[in-house]
Amino acid sequence: MKSRRDKLKIPSLTLDLSPNNQSPTLLSPCSPCSPNSPLQTLHPWSCRSSNRKSLVVGSPSPTLSRPLSPLSVPTAGSSPLDSPRNFSTSASVNFPFARSHGPRADRADGRRWSLASLPSSGYGTNTPSSTLSSSSSSQERLHQLPFQPTADELHFLSKHFRSTESVTDDDGRRSPCMRPRSRSLSPGRASSNFDNEIIMMNHVYKERFPKATAQMEERLQDIITHFCPSQTLPLADGVLGFIHHQIIELARDCLDKSKGALITSRYFLELQEKLEKMLQDAHNRSESEEVMFINHLARKLLMVIARPGRLLECLEFDPEQFYHLLEAAEGQAKVGQGIKTDIPRYIISQLGLTKDPLEEIVQLDHYDTESSLQLDQEDYHDPYIPSTPSRKKPCESDFETIKLISNGAYGAVYLVRHKETRQRFAMKKINKQNLILRNQIHQVFVERDILTFAENPFVVSMFCSFETRRHLCMVMEYVEGGDCATLLKNMGPLPVDMSRMYFAETVLALEYLHNYGIVHRDLKPDNLLITSLGHIKLTDFGLSKVGLMNMTTNLYEGHIEKDTREFLDKQVCGTPEYIAPEVILRQGYGKPVDWWAMGIILYEFLVGCVPFFGDTPEELFGQVISDDIIWPGGEEALPADSQDLITRLLRQNSLERLGTGGAQEVKQHTFFLSLDWNGLLRQKAEFVPQLEADDDTSYFDTRSERYHHLASEEDEETNDDESSVEIRQFSSCSHRFSKVYSSSEHLATQLNLSFSSTERSHSDEKEEHGDRWERTLSTEEEKNRLGAETRLRSWTSSGSSHHSWLSERSASPNVLTSTCSLDTMPRFAFSSEEESSDHKPERPTFTLGEIKGTPPKPTSLCDIVSLSRTRLRSNSTGAKNSTPRPLEAGVSRRLRGHRETPEKQSSSTGSRVPKSASVSALSLIITSDDFGSGSLASPISPRSLSSNPSSRDSSPSRESSVAVSSLRPPIIIHSSGKKYGFTLRAIRVYMGESDVYTVHHMVWNVEDGSPAHEAGLRAGDLITHVNGESVLGLVHMDVVELLLKSGSKVSLRTTPLENTSIKIGPARKNSCKGRMARRTKKSRKRENQDRKRSLFKKISKQSTVLQTSRSFSSGLHQSLSSSESLPASPTHSLSPGPITPSRSPAPDAAGDAVSPQSTSPCSSTPSSPAGHIRPSSLQCLTPKLSGQRYKVGRRKSTSSIPPSPLACTPSPVPQQPSSPQRSPSPLLPSHPRSGHCGLQGKTLSPPTIVRQSSRNRATEAPRSPLLKRVQSVEKMAAYLSSGRKASPVDIQHWEDTVDALEAMSESRNRDWGAEKHERDTEVVVMRRLNLSERRDSFKKQEAVQEVSFDEPDAGAVELVPEDKKTARCSGLWERLPHQTSWIQARTGISTPVTTEQETSCRLVPQIAVQTSESDEQEKSQGVWECQGFYPLQLSGKDKCPLVTLLSEPTGATSDRSQLKSEKISECPAPFALSSKRDSKKN
């Protein structure tokens, strides 16, 4: 008997009832659990009284066995009860298709269901939030396994388990056997099993309620017929258009499932949740009146499924399971392990019966009253009608076209600027006639809807759309970095890490799109744009299809197979190299086609070309269908994990293809094992584009040779009435764009009211501050009349709709305008203007429009107070002291920035470099010349404005600094108790690559509701000051001491960690050897004095433009630098950003070339010292300086250093003196102060792997978009032979240059050999030894190859014939491991010639390539050799004395003295480079 209790063995069934498994034992038949089995281990079936009828348990037959469980609601977690077993039929002998709850055929697998995972919601139909529906009819009679089954019962059970035939119960009814409960998704099981069970349940449902099913299907068909987007006029609002499409898709899917008898109550529940989410999106993201249409349509669909849903829920109710819950609760209460409260109260709460029924009636009455009031006031205010219905729609006249970005098959994309806001956008113009002829009108509406609806940092977003006479225009965010196809063309194959990041970000974009049912159908590198931070944005949805959004009830294999053939239009579209086999074979397709294209893209990233190619599409398609992938071998072989990923993505069968089951399959691949999917935007990209100007589109290929679209506007003969009514609906405004142009007058009124109400309580505090503000304004009005626009911006990205931001942008003509980014389109636009004579300081007024008269400076100290619950934070792109200020309601924080003298303010105005508005999207932009600072931010932070890395946000090529003392007003924390509510942590911040570190402190955690949280402190903030005292460099004990001395009130000044240059990286292996750079405590006044004293000391020593740069790194590839121009300069230039000081300024051709005036921070003219601040061509060759124990001269993170004209091969292009030159040489004789004398001691920058060569804008053949700016040697030679005489200014210019070079050479600590070549003036071109042959095997580098990631191997020099020098102008930026300098390598041939005339000329010194100490020790890492010399003949007075830069001190003195005494020409001769480590010293 004991063995029977322990193991009840039945043929084809094994019941393990041993206590070790903590299952219910037979020792306690009336209790669901034994004393040793806690509640969380209970099994959902229990033994009841033995007088019940024998239980008919499930059949193990193949047709009724357990299938895959697809039905898991997102809120249900991973509980076994989330599987769809609860929606199956009940198995009782008195009810057809009833399901059982006894021992199951699969008990042998040891699965234990946990009662603790049961949802807390009840089983009643009065709880709409219930995620659990029962599995049985409410009319069934419950059955149970016998306590001790007899032989007859065993025979009956075994016969039942072995057969699929029905059994007859005591009442004579036929009862079919049912399958056991379904469980979680597992491979290898039949996909039809689950469908069979649901079909039987639906059969019961249709038998019981035949009219309900027929009525639902009829109404669903009616909705689809009358409201289908193809049958109705498209909605003008893109978001609503997309939601409209999704609602119809949901109705169509419900109809298909009903006809296929696959309906469950859980499906209805999820359908209701999807509809509610769509309605919420419609109300939150649209202000159109068409919201009412979406609201009506969604409610209509909800009413259709309401009755069937209730009936199914009742039909699936499982009283046995309910009884089991009661017994389990009772047993658990007896044991005392869980429920301590009243058992009936617990059960009632589980049933959802705790609500007061009268409360709902009161709420309904209240709702009726509110509804009547709203109806009465409908004429005056409709909640669904925007507050400004008369707002002007966008039109083409609102934008001015700057230039063409690129051409496509359907239209062209132009860079445009909004005339009012001066923000840049990309405008896609599609010819309407072409659309009509190709019947593509509906498709362009789909593209508009997708772009408008999408809110994802990896998807390009649209701001507005409109139609003209000949075009449909879509205004999108401008992503400046070009596309990945151009990058591949110029670089060749990408390194694995770079490919992994690009691919991973595209996976996230694809996952987002697929969740909303969007199939891109045209994925390719051309449609992957690169943001200014080097991240990816997916664009071009012109061929996309919108299907059904993801539903968790559709995850079983049967539906997955249906999803792979979601579209049966038999249309072959896309780019041939990326089209999936099922599309070619016209078998129907779905989301897996995008994963096929992703496999092609990854292969192309890593190899450099696509795996399948052919001369014709037919040949290409034949390879796609039949051929295998050819993998590169040898040194070019791909890593095993990447090859495996590509192989799985390129499976011919779409069901076997990785990604078909969801993006999670791809994300879990070993190729991404080390990838942080949540921190992709925080990663520093290896390639960061560098923009030369506000309108720089040089990273894009215009493709004018392939496509040509008329840019002129329409014929006057064309009539607007000719456009169809459908096309007229194309004009729309997205949520993020419409906020800018909403009724600002109305908002300004509300703003003033809010200011007055919040400031009255602080009037006494602000009176003194306001007077000072007024006096400051009166002083500044006379000094500077530059207009300022103060715009209240709103961060409209998801999850941050309650935050608004104040952004001040300078309207100075010397300052770059802003551009828009994805999530940070300004919601309201205001400009600050002084009020009338009775103006009060604490009440600034905001009005719309440009400033006229004498507006206050944007740097004025005005008080900004909170607007109700709105948190304000400055996104200054030009304001001196506009600081971020997190404000709570009714609390105003004073701006505490240092005031400048008027002279310094005027100079700082000209040197501000405001970026695009997408910079404001991600970071705080501060250009504070007190500290020579800009800003730098990382995409993600609680304080950063957006996770969108678009349009030049915090581009490292802009000015940046860690001078955080003016970044944010102090956060004052008032603590009434013993704690402030935040956790402090000290971090080591290493100086560059060295072992020297400083201690910084960051906020590790902030408790919700604590005083620190209420004051605005957030986790991840770097603490810079405590009670006004700087804590940068203080040890942890000192900082804690400062906090403890504060008492109940502490003032903290913080900045987001990603707004600094601190990189986050792994712990250093040799951290024990680190040396902390301790800093003594000084008062702020003393620090300022010391800073000024050292600054003047440096200025007095050097007669050059002061450049300081410093970077801290502890691993986030961020760097920062600052630059200041001398007050004596005629105009203060716009610094291009991080600048690497140079030993040898580069010569530039055409000194008389006229460069157009530009507001670019990187473009300069001879009349501006901006060119002198620009790093010259050889700035990448920075030496080591004395007293430096760690690497220096490592290139700042992608500063805009132009390539040297010396590094390019001769070009047959004739000289064009009038062509604009972006980078005049710092040695041009325009200004006396032009030499470079950087403070090398502070150049501690992390390396960046990419170097972009900007290009000339002259009208050249579009052979290579990345080489247009490179100067040709012929231009230089022609200029050198032009016979121009030197002027006294030129002589002074050269003398100052020599002085600067003297100061630099005296500070060095390395012996730099200066070999004197017995040759004429030469241009030496360097080439890295033994380049990979992969670069030559793929024809993808017609232009500059910006990065070479080949392993450095010693080998022979590859010589290029003379006749090929002009053809191969592709420079390779090579970097050795641990190398501190960046060298541009070009191919050329060595032509050494020595003449008597050459020996009589001053000789060119050789500048040795400066490398780190580790490089000198590891010479096997790579060898640099001089490969080509390009002689430039000089004669007579045209000879240029050549500067001896790096000779020995003994010889350098005499050489320099001779140099000073000579007359010199206007253009310096180019320098000869040599990097031989064993160069001889003279």
Swiss-Prot record:
Active site, per annotation: D522 (proton acceptor)
Co-factor(s): Mg(2+)
Kinase recorded as keyword: yes
Pfam families reported for this sequence: DUF1908, PDZ_6, Pkinase
Entry similarity comment: Belongs to the protein kinase superfamily. AGC Ser/Thr protein kinase family.
UniProt feature, compositional bias: Polar residues: 75-87, 117-128, 904-915, 1242-1256
Keyword tags: ATP-binding, Cytoplasm, Kinase, Magnesium, Nucleotide-binding, Phosphoprotein, Serine/threonine-protein kinase, Transferase
Domain PDZ intervals: 968-1058
Gene: mast3
Species annotation: Xenopus laevis
Record field: compositional bias (Low complexity): 23-39, 59-74, 129-138, 175-187, 793-810, 866-877, 1109-1129, 1155-1169, 1218-1232
EC number from the UniProt entry: 2.7.11.1
Biased composition (Basic and acidic residues): 759-792
Domain AGC-kinase C-terminal: 673-745
Protein name (Swiss-Prot/TrEMBL): Microtubule-associated serine/threonine-protein kinase 3
Top-level division of the source organism's lineage: Eukaryota
Gene Ontology MF term list: ATP binding; magnesium ion binding; protein serine kinase activity; protein serine/threonine kinase activity
Principal subcellular localisation of the protein: cytoplasm
